[in-house]
């Protein structure tokens, strides 16, 4: 044992130094280039840590032959150590003459295997077939001749190693464990292999390149302790200081290089895209299945088998459905324009489900018979016409619109469907498309009638959004023939309207329509005027299908631009027309019975128009309702267009007068138009009386109203604005400008403050001096509306004394029925009433006899109108006698005679306003043209009976006490006494004579 230990170390050193001189026993190649050798040396070096005793034992190992233990021929020879090291990794399956065969070979096996028969084969006969993992257990393989032995070394063999060494030193073959002998030989091979691996790794440059990792960024090994290695790929590595986001230390666990990160992101993106596509496919599959079910119910029985096959396989319902439409790809290229075309071609016959109907059309287009017919009438599957059918002669024209629309889709102009091609019969409530399923065959049959002039004209006439009269509308619905249309054309030609006035009239009729309806109305009005001469217009409509959508868009923009300048053109046209023809010819008065009646167009443009035969109603611009604007201005837009002033109608002398009056109405509050109207001669006074009283745009006063109620209660109503009437007197402006910010009014019964003038004729819009509105919505809801409602319910009025005049405010329910609302709401209006002023030197202590009291206003209510003139004469004679008596007693009349308030104005020669204790103030000068045909009318010849107070005083005609003052027809007050003999005294003082 001592010799073996001593000889162990020199053998190990020599083996490591002279390892290159050996050759492989398998392939006879140098050990440095042999693959068998390299594979054996690739094991771990962990076994080098085994103690030196094992190396010494391996150096002096013996081979066994049978049950006898024989020494190897070379026992621990120092010179042969380099030969043994080259064969250390091979296992030799030797027979009985193993020693002699190894002696003849060039290399001597110092560490030989144990060739055993009964020792190894008895307990473990399957020892040769043991398989060991080369990576985990670092086992070596060798083959020599026919035998192969695979050994496994483990941690348990380390304990058996010492026993094996002890048994082999004593040459006790039977005592050596069968597995221990194999482990002993394996350990000997591993020790020599580790020695060979060290020397081989130092001399082989290829092994160095495989083991060293290089940074992908800098390309250098750098600091290996800061080199992070990719967890996915084998060659990805990067220093922590070379990373895009520098790390302080090498990341532990899962880390990916840049390339792997990019690849991972790409994979995730692909997966997400794939999921989205799958979800879309699922949704489309469900929708497609649902559509197939609906489609299955709509199609005939002959097609249900084919459709049922698609319903049974929903996965195939997406792509195969497109293949079935391949024949009509050019026609069904775009889905949305096709739906829009279907909407227009059905003439606004709305279906319950346009989308499903369009889907059902796809299958119907494939049928060889009547496919185009079904595409035009597919909406009839789900709906029926809800209005009266159109005439038979209009069907060819409607059919042409459908056919042109379909041709446009084939040519790629699916969006170029003009509004003129769709029926606008809904606007006039005249007609709509009949059941397409019933008349579809007739449309297809009458294809050749496209160029028929009567069909073209009848269609154009039916498309007009305004009708001349219910009679004309009835003719269109019943006849639809060229004869009735020619009659209408003759009516139009008989108008002889000037171009500018006609265009203004048309624009004024349509100014309250929506923009789309205006464009359609102008286009169709032009069609009607073009068809007056009877020239067929079918070619123009045929060419409509060939226009591009750009041309249609430009045309619509041009029409919109023209409509924007409508107001300026209207004013200019009215001014020019009225100045050009200031007088109305009378020789054409009987001619207007042949004219089409003037249409009454309301704000909705959707009602039938009334025919008033030969009498034209006075169109007025009375506003109805309240709508506050940002600056406190009311909205002057009107919702009513026609009304008769003084409940009368008059006949204008000619067509030009009719057109002019219609054109003036929307701009009646415009100063330029008003000036033109005032410049008109007196030949047509009734035209001036048609002017309406409306608020001016700017408010004249804004403040609060303090209403004094009974029992010393008061209520404050803030945010009230006063607007001056367009017919108010200029004196009203002077008074209103002196109003304080808070006006105090008394709440009184309306009958007690109702002017006597209103008791006979009633209050009219011309009597309104001021309009009262709320400045905003909040003020209206909190203050204005409760005040108006209270006054209407309790029949109250507001009364106040301001600047020497009396202000009376009433609710609008006291006005005529057509003037009671502003934007559909009640409002407040006010008038002024002049007050009497006493003489400068009145007697103070003279009692007032009961007979000298003025007759009560209530007694005037039931007087006999036939006695008015005689009562006037008696009253004048009484005043003369009163003045004479007073002059006889006092010698002079009251020098302090004063006129009544300046608001009572006399207009023209021979015209005087007569008022007593009360009189309306603020009436427009235009009321001078308003003539009353009753017995109370006093003509200018009778008004020459003016009474001069000075002359009466000089003649001494005034008698009686001076404490009673009466007003003469000149508005002069004087002190006199009247013996009251008759209670039914004429109340001429409260009427206005013209």
Swiss-Prot record:
GO biological process: negative regulation of gene expression, epigenetic; negative regulation of transcription elongation by RNA polymerase II; regulation of photoperiodism, flowering
Binding annotation for Zn(2+) 1: 215, 218, 239, 242
Biased composition annotated in UniProt, kind: Basic and acidic residues: 45-54, 119-140, 148-163, 469-478, 536-552, 858-875
Residues the record lists as binding Zn(2+) 2: 230, 233, 257, 260
Gene Ontology molecular function terms on file: histone binding; histone H3K27me3 reader activity; zinc ion binding
Compositionally biased intervals (Polar residues): 60-102, 417-435, 449-464
Low complexity composition bias: residue spans: 371-384
Gene it is expressed from: AIPP2
Tissue: Expressed ubiquitously.
Function: Together with AIPP3/BDT1 and PAIPP2, cooperates to form a BAH-PHD bivalent histone reader complex able to read histone H3 lysine 27 trimethylation (H3K27me3) and low-methylated H3K4 histone marks in order to regulate transcription, especially to prevent early flowering; promotes AIPP3/BDT1 binding to H3K27me3. CPL2 is subsequently recruited to form a BAH-PHD-CPL2 complex (BPC) in order to silence several H3K27me3 and low-methylated H3K4 enriched loci, including AGO5, via the phosphorylation state-dependent inhibition of Pol II release from the transcriptional start site (e.g.
Protein name: ASI1-immunoprecipitated protein 2
UniProt keyword terms in alphabetical order: Metal-binding, Transcription, Transcription regulation, Zinc, Zinc-finger
Deletion consequences: No obvious developmental defects. Enhanced accumulation of intronic heterochromatin (HC)-containing genes functional full-length transcripts (e.g. IBM1, At3g05410 and RPP7). Increased expression of At4g16870, a transposable element (TE) of Copia-like retrotransposon origin, associated with methylated status. The double mutant aipp2-1 paipp2-1 exhibits multiple developmental defects, such as a dwarfed size, early flowering, small leaves and poor fertility.
InterPro entries for this protein: AIPP2-like_SPOC, PHD1-3/5-6, Znf_FYVE_PHD, Znf_PHD, Znf_RING/FYVE/PHD
Domain comment as written in the entry: The PHD domain (212-263) recognizes specifically unmodified histone H3 lysine 4 (H3K4me0), binding affinity being inversely proportional to H3K4 methylation level.
Summary of subunit composition and partner proteins: Component of the ASI1-AIPP1-EDM2 (AAE) RNA regulatory complex composed of at least AIPP1/EDM3, ASI1 and EDM2 and may contain CPL2, AIPP2 and AIPP3/BDT1. Part of the BAH-PHD bivalent histone reader complex that contains AIPP2, PAIPP2 and AIPP3/BDT1; the BAH-PHD module associates with CPL2 to form the BAH-PHD-CPL2 complex (BPC) for transcriptional repression. Binds directly to ASI1, AIPP3/BDT1 and CPL2 but not to PAIPP2.
Any Pfam family hit: SPOC_AIPP2
Naturally occurring in which organism (per UniProt): Arabidopsis thaliana (Mouse-ear cress)
Family annotation (SMART domains): PHD (SM00249)
Signal peptide: none
Zinc finger (PHD-type): 212-263
């Amino acid at each position: 044992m001592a010799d073996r230990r001593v000889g162990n170390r020199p053998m190990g050193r020599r083996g490591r130094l002279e390892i290159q001189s050996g050759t492989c026993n398998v392939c006879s190649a140098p050990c440095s280039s042999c693959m068998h050798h390299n594979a054996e040396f690739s094991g771990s070096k962990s076994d080098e840590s085994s103690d030196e005793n094992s190396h010494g034992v391996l150096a002096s190992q013996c081979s066994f032959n049978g049950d006898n233990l024989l020494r190897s021929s070379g026992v621990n020879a120092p010179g042969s150590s380099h030969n043994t090291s080259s064969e250390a990794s091979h296992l030799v399956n030797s027979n009985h003459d193993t020693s002699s065969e190894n002696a003849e070979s060039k290399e001597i096996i110092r560490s030989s295997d144990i060739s055993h028969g009964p020792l190894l084969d008895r307990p473990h006969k399957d020892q040769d077939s043991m398989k060991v993992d080369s990576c985990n257990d670092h086992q070596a393989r060798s083959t020599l001749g026919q035998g192969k032995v695979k050994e496994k070394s483990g941690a348990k063999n380390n304990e058996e190693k010492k026993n094996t060494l002890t048994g082999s030193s004593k040459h006790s073959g039977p005592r050596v464990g069968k597995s221990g002998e194999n482990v002993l030989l394996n350990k000997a091979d591993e020790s020599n292999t580790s020695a060979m691996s060290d020397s081989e790794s130092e001399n082989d440059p290829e092994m160095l390149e495989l083991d060293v990792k290089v940074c992908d960024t800098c390309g250098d090994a750098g600091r290996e302790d800061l080199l992070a290695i990719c967890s996915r790929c084998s060659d990805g590595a990067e220093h922590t200081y070379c990373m895009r986001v520098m790390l302080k230390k090498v990341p532990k666990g899962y880390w990916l290089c840049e390339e792997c990160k990019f690849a991972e992101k790409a994979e995730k993106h692909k997966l997400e895209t794939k999921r989205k596509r799958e979800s879309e496919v699922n949704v489309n599959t469900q929708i497609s299945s649902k559509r197939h079910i609906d489609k299955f119910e709509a199609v005939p029985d002959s097609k249900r088998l084919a459709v049922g096959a698609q319903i049974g396989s929903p996965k195939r319902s997406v792509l195969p459905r497109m293949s079935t439409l391949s024949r009509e790809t050019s026609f069904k290229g775009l889905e949305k324009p096709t739906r829009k075309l279907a909407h227009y071609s059905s003439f606004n016959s709305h279906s319950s489900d346009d989308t499903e109907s369009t889907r059902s059309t796809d299958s119907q287009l494939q049928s060889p018979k009547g496919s185009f017919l079904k595409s035009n009438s597919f909406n009839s599957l789900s709906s029926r016409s809800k209005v009266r059918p159109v005439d038979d002669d209009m069907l060819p024209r409607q059919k042409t619109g459908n056919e042109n629309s379909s041709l446009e889709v084939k040519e790629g102009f699916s969006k170029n469907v003009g509004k003129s091609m769709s029926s606008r019969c809904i606007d006039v409530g005249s007609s709509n498309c009949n059941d397409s399923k019933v008349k579809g065959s007739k449309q297809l049959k009458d294809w050749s009638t496209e160029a028929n002039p009567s069909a073209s004209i009848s269609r154009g006439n039916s498309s007009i959004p305004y009708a001349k009269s219910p009679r004309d509308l009835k003719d269109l619905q019943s006849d639809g023939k060229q004869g009735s249309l020619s009659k209408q054309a003759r009516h139009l030609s008989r108008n002889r309207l000037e171009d500018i006035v006609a265009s203004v009239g048309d624009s004024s009729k349509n100014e309250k329509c929506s923009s789309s309806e205006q464009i359609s109305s102008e286009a169709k009005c032009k069609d009607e005027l073009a068809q007056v001469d009877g020239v067929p217009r079918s070619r123009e409509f045929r060419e409509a299908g060939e226009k591009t959508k750009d041309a249609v868009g430009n045309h619509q923009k041009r029409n919109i631009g023209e409509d924007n300048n409508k107001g300026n053109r209207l004013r200019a046209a009215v001014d020019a027309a009225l100045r050009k023809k200031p007088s109305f010819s009378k020789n054409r008065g009987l001619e207007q019975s042949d004219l089409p009646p003037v249409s009454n167009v309301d704000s909705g443009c959707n009602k039938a128009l009334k025919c008033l035969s030969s009498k034209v109603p006075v169109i007025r611009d009375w506003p109805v309702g309240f709508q506050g604007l940002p600056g406190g201005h009311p909205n002057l837009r009107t919702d009513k267009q026609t009304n008769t002033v003084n409940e009368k109608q008059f006949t204008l002398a000619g067509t030009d007068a009719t057109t002019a009056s219609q054109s003036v109405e929307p701009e009646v509050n415009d100063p330029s138009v008003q000036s033109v109207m005032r410049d008109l001669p007196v030949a047509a006074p009734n035209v001036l009386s048609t002017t309406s009283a409306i608020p001016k745009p700017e408010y004249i006063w804004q403040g609060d109203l303090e209403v004094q109620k009974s029992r010393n209660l008061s209520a404050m109503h803030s945010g009230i604005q006063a607007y001056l009437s367009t017919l108010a007197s200029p004196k009203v402006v002077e008074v209103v400008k002196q109003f304080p910010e808070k006006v105090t009014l008394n709440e009184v019964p309306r009958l007690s403050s109702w002017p006597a003038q209103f008791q006979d004729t009633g209050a009219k819009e011309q009597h309104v001096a001021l309009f009262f509105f709320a400045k905003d919505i909040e003020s209206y809801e909190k203050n204005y509306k409760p005040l108006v409602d209270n006054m209407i319910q309790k029949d109250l009025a507001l009364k106040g004394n301001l600047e020497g005049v009396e202000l009376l405010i009433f609710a609008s329910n006291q006005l005529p029925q057509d003037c009671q609302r502003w934007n559909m709401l009640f409002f407040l209006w006010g008038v002024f009433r002049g007050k009497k002023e006493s003489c400068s030197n009145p007697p103070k202590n003279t009692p007032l006899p009961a007979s000298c009291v003025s007759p009560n206003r209530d007694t005037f209510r039931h007087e006999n109108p036939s006695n008015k003139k005689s009562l006037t004469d008696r009253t004048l004679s009484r005043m003369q006698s009163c003045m004479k008596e007073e002059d006889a007693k006092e010698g002079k009349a009251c020098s302090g005679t004063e006129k009544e308030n300046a608001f009572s104005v006399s207009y023209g020669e021979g015209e005087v306003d007569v008022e007593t204790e009360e009189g309306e103030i603020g009436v427009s000068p235009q009321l001078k043209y308003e003539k009353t045909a009753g017995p109370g009318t006093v003509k200018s010849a009778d008004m020459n009976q003016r009474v001069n107070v000075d002359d009466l005083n000089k003649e001494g005609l005034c008698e009686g006490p001076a404490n009673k003052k009466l007003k003469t027809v000149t508005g002069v007050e004087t002190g006199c006494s009247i013996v009251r003999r008759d209670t039914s005294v004429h109340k001429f003082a409260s009427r206005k004579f013209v």
